[in-house]
Regions:
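Inhibitory N-terminal propeptides of secreted protease zymogens
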Residues: 1-67, 193, 340
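Loop/turn elements at helix/coil->beta-strand transitions in domains of secreted/extracellular proteins
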Residues: 54-56, 94-97, 155-158, 188-194, ...
Length: 342
């Protein structure tokens, strides 16, 4: 449950058990992990809480999954080579502070050892912290190994929130509780943009936290998911306020497993991209998760004052059906110096 301000009298007002309480100074909200009694109706409880505290959100502590797969074929390109067709080089990144909410990042990897990374764990419990997904995304964003590998923003500052754990009962997942706390940390650290390469069900608590984050001037970028073209929209990408990203290959063809829909905003490279692997190696990765950081870097650089982020839909390279469509959105993200210049 998420309520405005710093609420202290929740337990005395309702017949519930409070498992955890988090004061979120960045979002100016309070997050509760509560357990209702067996005879309580969650919808009725949510209504009662909303009547007492105002604009609140009550929902299950839903779980979210990462959205990328390793591939056995050789990589098509490095991040910078993949990004060349987006015009990404027209933007600087010196002042960029990137927020990454993902798995734990292997900071011992040669591509990340000397990167400016501040990492914090937000997982409740003792489950194993997976490394693969977050390490890959971090390398695409800020990785650099002399002569071997360079990410999109090697001079940027990365704030990496570890929110995933690996449990036998649920696999590799992140809870809403962890995600909301991570969003609060990002607001506290005044990041320029947040990358959410994950997907799952709708959740009113997560949506409220994302809306408050965006109200603080921080764009949120999310992958649309890899459940296939016939799948229902996945969240958080399907929230109207979030920039939803799909993946295309080196020939600008949509990734065959990408979710489609009217919520889609932009396409970006996301098929067989070279990325770091835990332990020091590199390998090709594919998925809408991999496409998201290409959009994240462009929005982050634009949010430092170089270019208004809202203009990127206008300067995207149209793909597929002319105009907006449910496969590519507005098209391949492109940084044009003036609208229409590509």
């Amino acid at each position: 449950m998420l309520v405005d301000g710093d609420q202290l009298n929740l337990q005395s007002s309702f017949n519930i058990s409070i498992r955890a309480r988090h004061s979120l100074s960045g979002l100016d909200m309070t997050l509760f992990n509560i357990q209702a009694n067996e005879d309580q109706d969650i919808a009725e409880l949510a209504l009662e809480i909303d009547q007492l505290f105002g604009d609140s959100a009550v929902d299950a502590n839903h779980l979210y999954e990462t959205e990328a797969t390793g591939t056995y074929r050789e990589a098509d390109c490095t991040p910078r080579d993949c990004a060349a067709r987006t015009g990404w080089h027209l933007l600087g990144n010196a002042d960029m502070r990137i927020g990454l909410i993902d798995t734990k990042v292997d900071q011992s990897h040669p591509a990340l050892k000397f990167a400016e990374i501040t990492q914090r764990d937000f997982v409740q419990g003792r489950g194993k912290r997976p490394l693969s997904h977050g390490t890959a995304i971090a390398s695409i964003l800020v990785g650099q190994q002399s002569g071997l590998y360079t990410g999109l923003a090697p001079d940027g500052q990365l704030f990496a929130a570890s929110v995933f754990s690996n449990l036998d009962s649920s696999g590799e997942t992140a809870s809403v509780e962890s995600l909301v706390r991570a969003l609060d940390w990002m607001v506290e650290n005044r990041v320029s943009v947040i990358n959410l390469s994950m997907a799952g069900p709708p959740d009113t608590v997560l949506e409220k936290a994302i809306l408050r984050t965006i109200a603080n001037g921080i764009p949120v970028i999310a992958s649309v998911g890899n459940d296939g073209p016939a799948a229902e929209p996945m969240f958080p990408a399907a929230y109207p306020s979030v920039i939803a990203v799909t993946a295309v290959d080196a020939n600008n063809r949509v990734y065959r497993k990408a979710v489609r829909g009217a919520h889609l905003d932009l396409a970006a490279p996301g098929v067989r991209v070279l990325a770091a692997e835990p332990g020091g190696a590199y390998g090709p990765v594919t998925g809408t998760s991999i496409a998201a950081p290409f959009v994240t870097v462009i929005y982050g650089a634009g949010n430092t004052g170089t270019k208004p982020p809202s203009s990127y839909q206008k300067t995207a390279i149209d793909l597929g059906t002319p105009g907006f469509d449910t496969v590519y959105g507005y098209g391949l993200i492109h940084v044009a110096q003036t609208p229409g210049e590509k």
